[in-house]
Amino acid sequence: KTLNKVGAAAGLNSGETGTLVWTVMASRGLNSVMAKESKKLTITRLVGFEEIPAQLYLTGSATEGGMDASKAVACASPEKDKFEVFTKLEGGKTYKLVDRAAEGAKVFYINGNKIMEGEGETTVEKTGVYRIEMDFSIASVTVREVSKMEFYFCPSGAATFELPYVGNGVFCGQDKIEFKQEGWGRDQRYKFLMTYADGSIQYWGTKNTTDSNPGAATPEDPYFYIMETPDNQWDQKWKLNNEFDGAADGYNPGAITKISVIFNVENYTHKVELAN
């Protein structure tokens, strides 16, 4: 992508190949000297978009919002030129990408692993929850079906209950959580585990490294922000407040905890609350 930016600065259009002449200039203070030797570099620019939409939505009969343009499903933008959405799609029905949730929007569609501009439409073979990642700078897209999201309890080294998809980019589930008694106290560390339909997995943990529980932090606090994390048992985890220890010998016997993982916001986050 760096060479792609160099090609753009040199005036090459998307997908075009050109040969550039480059050299080195050294400077110190106000003085600069250009090297006498130069080299040639041939670059083929990636097939991307010159004008990247400021926002992106999914609309169509396959989407959660249906054909109503005002109910188009908004995508998040985790990085410059990139968009992403977790959403349910109906198999055999169609959807497209638009730059605003209104009639007359600019339209894009997915063709294989490429993003195309124009009045095309896209389908998925089966109904399911999908993660769609789009990079407009190189016109590429990855579509993966999410089979499940689970609460991962670090002391057990395992997922203990599932968070079903409930719509609008949110996974939500509830169960009793029993902190694990250790010699030093009760262990309450956790993160999340996402499994894709192909069997691959992705852990989701804290975006802001922490080794404490949230205390009185509000649900909007950055403490709860989530991000993709490495495949391991202990790193980048959170800690639950004592009120969520529903074990018979815990702080709140019988407590049922409700957890929501939320992907429909700029900073992906999660919410923990008592269900009962």
What are these regions (language model features)?
Residues 1-276:
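Insoluble glucan recognition modules
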